[in-house]
Structures are given as C-alpha cells and as structure tokens.
Amino acid sequence: IVGVQLRNLATVGGSIYSRFGFSDVLTMFLAMDCDVELYKGGILPLQEYAQRPYDRDVLVRLIVKKTPMQLYCQSVRNSQTDIPVLTCAAARMETGDYRIVIGARPLRAVRFELPAEPALAAEQLAAQFAESIKAQIVTGSNMRGSAEYRKHLAGVLTKRAVLELEQRKMQEEK
C-alpha cells in the first residue's frame, strides 16, 4: 500500500476495513473462506462486507476458517513499490472447484466461483477459466492502465494461477 515507509505501518485489519480497490490483502482474503466481525454489525462473510457501502462500524476481527485449499496470489505493477495495476488470487478447493478473485481493476475486488472440470487437461481448464473471467469482468481505466489492458491481464493471471494450482495438485498425487 502506497510506499515502503507507509507499508511498514499498514495492518491487515486496516486494509480489510477500508476495502480499497487496490488492496492486495483484500484480494487474497476474499479467495479464502473468511468472515469479519463488526462491533455493531456482528459476524458476516468477507465477500458480503467487501460489497457493502462504507460505514463507521468498527472491524473487531477477521475470522479465517480452516477450509482445506491451495492458494496462489499474484499482481502486476508498473514498478515494485507502486500500487497494483491488477491483482489475482486463486483458490483450488478440495472438491476441485475454483474461486478466482480479481482486484485493483481499479474497482473493488470481485470474486468468481468456477466449478470443477475433471475431464479437462490443465491447459484446457486454465484457458476455459481465463476466457470465462475475461467475458464477465468489468474493468476501468486510470493512469496505471486501460480497461482493455486490465481485462487482458485478468485472463493472463487467471490462466497462470490455474496452471500453477493444477501443477501443485499433480505433484501431490505423485
């Protein structure tokens, strides 16, 4: 977040609470199975909290459930210390289903649920998921990149993430 000096002061709770569109942290936790506890609002899924309008409630804690999954996160930046052009977090559940989260689009992060396709080879699965996300995602433009560039990156990062997670699965099976 911002520069190195401020990044060393940033907290997970602050990043989750603010729900910034460029947050790497929010993108990663949205791919996981998480809830948040709000002082007035009680416990609710992080996915629901991330879509809510801003309010003045206090974030008490982030609850990370111990759901078995493989997770892979990546981002594209114009420079190492810059905020991201696009972020991607992918989770492969034990069932083979996928949860892909795309952030810094530059809108708030969005999550896609994709069903398992056991009949497809890893390369085909990755290409299919990448095309699906490119067709569905809404991106915007700013000084870091155009909407078209971000849409293209969403497909590329999704494909890389699925290939990585499928490769991990094959290594575990050996």
Segments (PLM) and residue ranges:
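C-terminal structural segment of proteins
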Residues: 1-174
